[in-house]
Structure formats: structure tokens, C-alpha cells
Amino acid sequence: MGYIRGKVRVIIYEAESNYKVGVLKVKETNDKGLEEFLGKSLHFTGYFGTLQVGDNYEMEGNLIYKEKYGYQYNVTDYKKMEVTGYEAVIEFLTSDLIKGCGEATAKRIVDTLGNDAIKKIKEDKSILMTVPKMSEKKALKIYSSIMSNSSVDDDLIKLKEMGFSINEALNIINKFQKNALSIAKTNPYALKEIIDFKKLDNIYLSGENPDETLRVKNCVLETIRLLEIRNGDTYFYLEEIRDGLKTYFNIVDVDYLEEVINSLESNKDIYREEKRIYLNSTYSMEVEIAKKLNYINSLPITGKNISMIDTEIEKLEEKLGVTYDTEQKTAIKRSLENRISIITGGPGTGKTTIIKAITSLYMKMYNLSPSNVNSYIALLAPTGRASKRLSEATNLGASTIHKYLKWNKDMNEFQVDEFNQNYQRLIIIDEVSMIDTNLMYHLLLGLTNTIQIILVGDKDQLPSVGCGLVLKDLIDSDLFNFCPLETIHRQSENSYIPYLAKEIKNKDITSDFLSKKDDYNFLRVDNSKVLESISRVCELSIKRGHTDKDIQVLAPIYKGINGIDNLNNHLRDLFNPKSDKKREIKIGDITFRVGDKVLQLVNDPERGIYNGDIGYIDSIVSVNNTKTLNVNIDFDGNLVSLTTGEMINVRLAYAISIHKAQGSEFVNVIMPVCSSYYKMLYNKLIYTGVSRAKKSLMLVGTVEAFLMGVNNNYSMDRKTSLKDQLLKYI
């Protein structure tokens, strides 16, 4: 049967059934009909067990063509290709380390000089001239590159033979220097901070005489980490870990698991508290958060006469032409009087109004001016869009937490820490429900003990993506000044959205939710008609002069007919139809087009773009008149140029997930509510989606699905210890 051989470049999609979609760079084939793909990337689909990015595979199957996706290779059988010395040397010669050596040249070198070609070239550079089609200029360039990397090339090739890519091998050598190869051979799990754990596990299992106990120990730690990501808990019980080992690593019937846990505890890798089992790092973070917050909260506010606040609030009301109600005045005053305060409320309750009042009063009390205010006050939020809203509301500078802490993407660490702290006096953090244990810990490390902290958020929104329930635990501890806002202050008397959000939160939906309002409508259609109905609504909006900047579709899941991916494919052709004047580029399974609305998926502080930022593709351009293309994206005035590799972290944004929308607001929101979403349609998710709408909200789907979701408490419970630690370290 025909086959293709090559390196897996990326896994685009992976289902629980082990069905995968990926991209293979084709290096070899025995099928003449596939020779046109040699040296090119080809999409493949099929059912796979373990499939590692960067590894080489032989795949059997047949080429198919789909109008929507183009050519794909439908895989019926596959096997991993063992890395030989021959292939490892070629990989090294064709890497970015060696100048002037393409794949054809590399093969001729190894075919002529053998697997020890590098050694021979280092001993006698003239030997390169025995290679067919070799020029003196090219030989000198290759020799110079080899010699400049002579200290690492042997280890690079040996690490490549073990299964690491050249880039991975370089990272290992840079981190562990002369011990790199020894560590990789004896305990590759020590590389887990820089290399994917599953790849390390496969490399260890394929080595000589793997130690089962060493593997189980490391798999236990990785299982707990994966459970933290999946469940959001900060601790687990033994049976949960046992089940996780089976799920993630097919490790079953470990009769000595208790001994492994005890050993990991002795090594301070995990922490046990009765039946609770934590990663030691997570446990320590909860403890340190509790200690620091309690210490800060114990310090008095000094330097100003607090009794003057009431008078200053009255002056501010007169200046701004507003009247704060009792609830708002209490929140403003108490936040200025206490070291740590928590202000929570749903949409329309005036959280932003209160932040503006607090910053204005603080500047007045401490005689601050716009020129020096940033030295005294820091306004922060978890996302770029939320920090921008904060800045617009207060007319002051605001920042993401990652930018404030000077996060280094390459090193994956914050430059601001306990040894290099920021020295503002007041810090106000919005959208606190999005902050997980890890981020809160690092934020507090970067703050002095004399800081004044005001935490603002909506306790009924989705919890953080990372583990923990920081906001809820702080409130439940009853140790800090807590100001809940219940009264809705929405400018329009006919505004229904905040009232609907409140009904969803309280699970007390009235029949009024079926009636059309000035800012709300429930379009009742069957699941099979949801996509068509949303498309029709958007078509009508376009005819009325609206653009994709005015409308945001929010959905809970990516796959399926009513999932985000399918919604994006349909909506893009409405808002940004194909045109000969609009250049396109296909990356993975997504075709990007000039003018497309796109979403950034990861933080990139050096470029000033962050997870959740929305931008528009400005242009797709050739780099230095080559075939290499870059994509220029305008993120609200910040024009960023991304390589095709970096575009893996970008998605179409005509429809986005409700999780990604958290921390943002949109003028008009359309939200499908389908029974096909099943468990992923739950109370906090619906509440969060509804509360993203500023001017209008349209729900599209069935009443049954909506009510089912409102009454579904999925995701509300997480096992955390921050509250316990707060009470312990008062």
C-alpha cells in the first residue's frame, strides 16, 4: 500500500476517541501520485494512539480532496520511524545552526562521508570537496558553521537519536550544559519544565531498562498537575490520583502507590494534609497568599484624616454631577479606610463608577497629579481588553497583571518578584474572578507589605481557568472589608440585560424572559436551525450598516454544527467575503484572509498583545521577496507582525468562547443556547455570557436548553484550601 513519511509539525485537533487532525511535512513516498507533496506540508486525518509533534512517522492511507479543506491524507495505518544516526546527522546539517546546507546537500554529505561525517569534516575541511556538487564557497560556509557549534554537535546528534528535535536538544543543552546528555539518558523527566511530559515519558519507555518506580513517581506528579488544569482543584484524594494515572498514562493496579506518595512527600514534591494530597508548590502558594494578605490587612491606614472622606465624596458628587446611593458611598468610603477591600457586583451595579470615584478621591487626598499618579496608583486587570476599559473609565494608565509583573515569555517567569518589587501605594484589580492561585501568588510577591489593595469583580462569573477559587475563598473567609453591590444602576430605564443576569444568578427566571425588550430578544428555534438563524440575524445587521465590530457571537464549545469553529466559517463569509483583492493564507485547518477578525490566544507582553485580545488582519506580506509570509494584525492601533508559526496562537473571532470573552464587554451579543451543548451549558457560563452584553443581547435556541443551563451548577465546586489557610494564619 502507498505511504508517506515525514515529520509531524502540529496536531490541530484531537478528540477523546483518538481521532486526530494534523500536518505532516512529507519527506518520502512510494506513491507517484503523492510526489508533488514532497518537501511540502500535508494535512492528515485518522485514529492514532500516541502521536508526538516533531517525530517522524510512516503513514499508510489515501489522498482525498474536500472543497472546504483542500487535500488531506486519510490515514489507515501508521508507525513511528526510528531515528537513525543517518537521519540525526541530516537533521543537524539542515537545522538553522548550519548555514548553506539544504536537505539535498545534507544527504549527499552523509551518503559520501558516512554517519560520522561531522567528525571527518572537523578533522579535515577539505573532505567536503569530495561531496558531489559541492562548491568551495558552500563548503567553507558549512565548515565554519560546524566549527562554531563544535562544542554541542555530538550531544545534539545523540539527543536527536533519542527522539528530541534539534530545537529541543538545544534547549536541553542550554539549560543543563555538560550534564545535558547524562540527564536525558538517566532521568529525562528532569527536563519536564522545557519539554512536553508525554514526549519525555515515551523516550524513557523506549530506553534501556526503564525503572518503573521512577516513572510512576513522575507520572503521579504530572497527573496531579493535569487534574489541577482539568478540575481547578488545589488538592486531590488518593483514588482520584489512581484514576488519573489510568486515564492519562494507562498505569493500573499500582499496589505500591501509597509508598510512592510517601516518597514524593519526603522529597517535598507533594504535601499531605490528612487525606488531602497537593503539589507542594500549590500548597505553598495558598499558604503564602494567606500569610501576606493577613499581614497587609493587619496594618492601619495612616497619613490622612479618614473622617474627611464623607465631605470629599459630597464634593466629588457635585463636581461630576452624580449622586451615589448608600451602597456605593459605603463601598467608596470603606475601600479607602481599609488595607484590603473586595467589591463585587453584577452588570449595571456600578463597579466601574466606584473605581473612578476611589481613584479621584485618592488623588485628591494625597495631592497627586496626572504626571505622578502612576507612581502611587496601579490599575490592573487579567486581560488586555479589561485593562483598556479600566483606563478609559478612569482616564489613568492601566495594565495587564502580566505586564505589570514584567512576565518574560521565553523564560516563563516574572521579573517583578520579592527581590524586585513594585512600590505603588494603592493597587486596584478588576475582573478578580479570573485570577487563579498561581497569578495571585506572584502578584503578591511583587507588592510591598504596605500596599493598599482593592479587588473588584463579579463573584458569580466563571471561575479562573487555572486552579483555585481565590475571590470566593477571600470572601468566604470573612476577614476582609467586603462590599457587595446589589442595586442595578443602568442608564436606560428600559435596560433588561442586568435584570436577566440577576435572575440567572439567583436561578429565579420569570416568564418575562420570553418577551422582546429594547435591548433583549430570545429567538426560539430548534437546534438544527440555530446556525441558520444566527447567520440570518447577522445578514440583516450588515444590511443595516453594522459590521463585525458591532456584533460578537459567544458560544461554549468549539466542535459541532453550532460550535465556535463552524460558526466562524459561516460568519466570516458574511462579514468578510472572499475577494481577489484580499490575500489569504492557510495555517493548520484555518484559512486567514485580509480583513478577518481574529483572537490572540496567548500572552505576548513584548509585542503588547494578550490572551483574549481581538484584532483585524491588516495585510499578508512576503518577507524579503521570498515565499515566506508574515501576517500583520491591527490590535486596536497596535500593528503586530506574526510569522506563520506564531499564527498557531491566533483564531478567527467572529464567534469566540464565553471563557475567552470573560473580562471583555461587547456592544451587541448573540449567544446560542442549544441542548447539544449538554453539560457545557451551565449557570455560571450563561451568566458570564449574558453579562458581556452592553447594549443588546439575543439568545438563539430552545427555552428548554436555556432553563436546563440556568439550573445546572456544573463547575461551581472546587476543592481549595485558601480559606482554611487564611483562617489559620490570622
Regions found by a protein language model. Give the residues of each.
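Short aromatic-glycine-enriched beta-strand elements
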Residues: 13-26, 624-632
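Structural detector for short beta-strands of small beta-barrel domains
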Residues: 1-16, 61, 617-618
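Long, highly charged, low-complexity intrinsically disordered interaction regions
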Residues: 15, 24-215
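N-terminal pre-P-loop "Q-motif" helix
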Residues: 321-337
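Interdomain "pre-motor" coupling segment immediately N-terminal to P-loop NTPase/helicase cores
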Residues: 66-68, 246-307
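Conserved helicase motor core of P-loop NTPases
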Residues: 351, 370, 460-599, 604-607
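C-terminal accessory regions
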Residues: 613-624, 628-730
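Conserved helicase motor core of SF1/SF2 NTP-dependent helicases
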Residues: 342, 353, 357, 361, ...
